[in-house]
Regions:
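Secretory targeting and sorting signals
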Residues: 1-28
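Active-site beta->alpha N-cap acidic-glycine motif
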Residues: 29-113, 117, 123-128, 137-138
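Catalytic domains of cell-wall/extracellular-matrix polysaccharide-remodeling enzymes
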Residues: 62, 84, 108-218, 222, ...
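Compositionally biased, intrinsically disordered low-complexity segments enriched
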Residues: 9, 104-105, 199
Length: 231
């Protein structure tokens, strides 16, 4: 499918400045597209866990232990400043088989940036990730605050699929692990990509909530997969 057709499809729906469309078989071919995906792979009761703003020891390390114990793979959306500070944690994330996502260098609002500015930022962030893990594949890009601006096309051109989310558990002000786990229960729908945080503050309650909810989801027949990937 041609890039011009991708652009026509992506332009059809604009939500909060981001390009978002219902997944279709037509977009499943070729490389990344500027369409922001918010859907987990597979059919039926599937869900994807994604974690933003890290790496952030010790919380990221505790989270990795929970995911490893439960045989779950997730997406980690990494901020360049944090990658530079904690490259050893990035190596651990990749070594344990999780998927990497570029979350910009400084967690800036990109909505008013030019394509050239966005490209420079994303390229610098990816370079830091590759310094930590030379063999890493950076599959996704997620715009800070969901302020996409012109970043979806830039990310796609750099080989990264723009990654959105179906819902955010709002863990930036920790209300308690039980409350966070209940938010997942209440908001969960088949195919959801869930936004959580392992960085940006004390995320111990998020780690506890994840440890609570995974066995419950499995018992109810949910499968934890990765988000859709165009290409």
């Amino acid at each position: 499918m041609s890039r011009s057709l991708f652009r026509c499809l992506a332009a059809a729906v604009t939500v909060a400045g981001a390009l978002t469309v219902t997944p279709s078989a037509a977009l499943a071919h070729g490389g990344p597209t500027p369409v922001v995906v918010d859907t987990a792979r597979g059919h039926g009761n599937v869900v994807s866990f994604t974690f933003d703003d890290g790496p952030n020891p010790p919380d990221t390390l505790h989270l990795l232990a929970v995911l490893r114990k439960n045989h779950v793979k997730a997406v980690f959306c990494l901020v360049g400043d944090q990658v530079k500070a904690h490259p050893e944690v990035v190596r651990r994330i990749a070594a344990e088989g999780h998927t990497l996502c570029n979350h910009s260098m400084h967690h800036d609002d990109l909505s008013t940036w030019t394509p050239a500015q966005i490209e420079a930022d994303l390229a610098a962030t990816s370079a830091l990730i590759h310094q930590a893990v030379p063999w890493a594949h950076i599959a996704y890009f997620r715009a800070p605050y969901g302020a996409w601006g012109q970043s979806p096309q830039v990310a796609a051109d750099l080989g990264m699929q723009p990654l959105g989310w179906r819902f955010d558990i709002e863990d930036w002000v920790p209300p308690g692990a039980d409350v966070l786990a209940q938010r997942i229960r209440d908001r969960l729908t088949p195919g959801a990509v869930i936004l959580m945080h392992d960085g940006g503050g004390d995320r111990s309650q998020t780690v506890e909530a994840v440890a609570q909810i995974i066995p419950e989801l499995r018992a109810e027949g949910w499968r934890l997969t990765l988000p859709l990937r165009r290409g």
